[in-house]
Amino acid sequence: MKPTKYLLSLLLSGALPCAGAPFVPAPHAPLAPTSGEKAADSTVVSSPRQLNEATVTAHAEATRLKYAPQALTLLSARQIDGSASSLNEVLGRVAGVTIRSMGGVGSSSRISVRGLEGKRMGLYIDGTSAGQISNFVSLDDIPTDMIERVEVYKGIVPYRFGGTAMGGAVNVVLKDYPPRYLDASYEVGSYNTHRANSVFKRSFADLGLELGLGGLFVASDNDYEMTLHNLNDLRVRRGNDAFRKAVLGGSIKETKWWFDELKSEFILTSTRQGIQGIDWDYRSAHNHASSFLVSLEAKRKNFFVEGLDFDFSTAYNIGRYGLCDTARVRHAWDGRTYPTLSPLGGETGPFASDGHHRSHDWIGKLNLEYTLRPDHALNLNLYGTGTWQQPHNELMDRSLGYPGNFDSRLTALTTGLSYEAFFFDRRLQTAVTAKHFLIGSRAKMLHNFYLRDIKTIHINRSEWGANFAACYRITPLWTVKGSVASEVRIPTSEELLGNSFNILPSPDLLPERNKSVNAGVLYRRSFSDDRVWEAEVNVYMSELTDMVRFTPDLLPTMARYTNFGQVRTMGIEAEIKADVTRWCYLYANGTWQDLRDRRRTFPNSKAPNPTYDLRIPNIPYLMANFGGELHWADLFGRRQNTRLLLDASYVHRYSYDFEMGAYLEKLIPTSLTFDAAIEQSFANRRWTLTLKVKNLADRETVSEFNRPLPGRTCSVKLRYLLR
């Protein structure tokens, strides 16, 4: 059984095929892999253990995905249950993927795939979008214990996911659970960091009823020391970066009614996060958020018509959030105090803030798949979203002298029609997709916070996109893949409407359009003793027009999204991983990517652009990861497992501004970090004890516009599993 699509630690439901997988042919049709391959292989198995039926099914699904036409990296339980404490740390070791964080545990972070980042990335849990509610829950909230595998799509996003993701997607597939299951863990680490999560499931087979309950709690002071290079290398300790988050959820599922599966879920969240200053020593400013989500899902095969599969899901989330900044003085790092810019307070900017905003978010997805013949299928996907923001910040309005926050609405509908087919004894797989996008928004905005210039904007847009992907198995060991796409991404609610405290509305943003091509080759060899060797190389090129970028506003501490222009991307990535022996696993990957500004002139003018053909700033262009694992069974006694893990990450220095003139010195230095872990399990993995050390050499690392990151950290984790 799987937890909720929106936060895995919480809700438990029945096993289902991954939404991004190729369609499953009729029972008499042969399934890939072809002869000479095994459906389950060691690249998707964690440490040696007995596999139940659900696990074998999940492994067969992962093997099918390796031969899907999309460019794809699979992260197995072996790679997830390693030295990482969070999903972001796991994703940061994937070829072509970078994670840019602003600080320690719980800090703002962005996932970048092949240089395309942030809102372009599709974020999914069991095939259902989590991006619409990312202000309240994120992929990084998902405990790694609960993840079966992670699918990182590069380029084309599978049609079944729906939505407007462009250039890449991350889909987290949750573990299947037996009828009775209890999983609880607790981790304590440096800087007073605590992580606790648990999940419980109980099934009543005679009634077809399944109940699930779960939750998590994460807290950290994040009070590590950092060097402020902008203040003559001053060494200070962070004092306002504490993070607290709690989540509780439950689910109920029925499998003996007319629908094959009918499921309802709920999630409660609460978050408080301090705002750490760099130029100034912030003491009390913080963000807060809470939300309540309910969802409903229904599935049925042969929906009134033989061969037609019905999959419907919908969710509604109501959230409250805001920035609290009421400090009456500002603090410099040398201890001196200064008056705030506003007589009403505010240490982070020119205005005081006590936001109590409300947002309503709705998501709905309908997927209809019709199997025309055993090797041919037609798929219709409808994906709709709606957002209604109700900002409320009386203190900020008083600071301005007039209202500066207004209600706004945004609706979007994406319609996708896909055709998937196999040829030549299933050696050739093709998928073609056409999409239509509709978006409508109503909003008011201030063009200038210093002038009461309120403008009402109504927008209705319609766009088309399409893509084609194919893969061909030359031999049982060699597979080639390729794809071409002309895709559109509709700006998100945050990009268009802002967030009512530090991101200003930009309702006149244009949709992004991306033209891309990808080609790759995969070598995969399975051995009779369950070992696997795998190597893959991909080359890619894309051209993004009307690129949306997050840029500072003329108003201090405020920012907005703007259309940047034209960006060309080209790159190559390679990965190799191998079970060298039954007790030794090694991997390595590398990425070179080149993103260039292709605007010949400034927007709306004929003036030449001085940054033409320069590298886009704040995006790494040369990266590598490598590591390995040693594992033994019964090394220190019967029914025990031992694992030793080492992971390394290299990022070559890069600039956080255009490399021209005085900005040549705005460099983020090269980083090489090592993480290690020792894991010992007892009683057939009922008890597991793990010791983790990150950044072994205690190197200084920075990211995201030269923001300092933590040095060496240590943690210990205890997990109890009853099944």
Spans of features found by a protein language model:
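Periplasmic-side early beta-strands and strand-to-turn transitions of outer-membrane beta-barrels
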Residues: 179, 187, 204-285
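N-terminal periplasmic "start-of-domain" segments of outer-membrane beta-barrel proteins
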Residues: 49-81, 110
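Conserved C-terminal beta-signal and adjacent last beta-strands/turns
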Residues: 241-255, 269-271, 471, 482, ...
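Short acidic/polar hinge/loop motifs at secondary-structure boundaries
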Residues: 128-155
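Gram-negative outer-membrane beta-barrel transporters
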Residues: 424, 534-535, 540-543, 562-655
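Membrane-embedded beta-barrel scaffold of Gram-negative outer-membrane proteins
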Residues: 473, 481-485, 512-570, 591, ...
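Face-selective signature of the C-terminal outer-membrane beta-barrel domain
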Residues: 252-270, 289-450, 455-457, 462-463, ...
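Extracytoplasmic beta-strand/coil segments of soluble accessory domains associated
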Residues: 72, 88-129
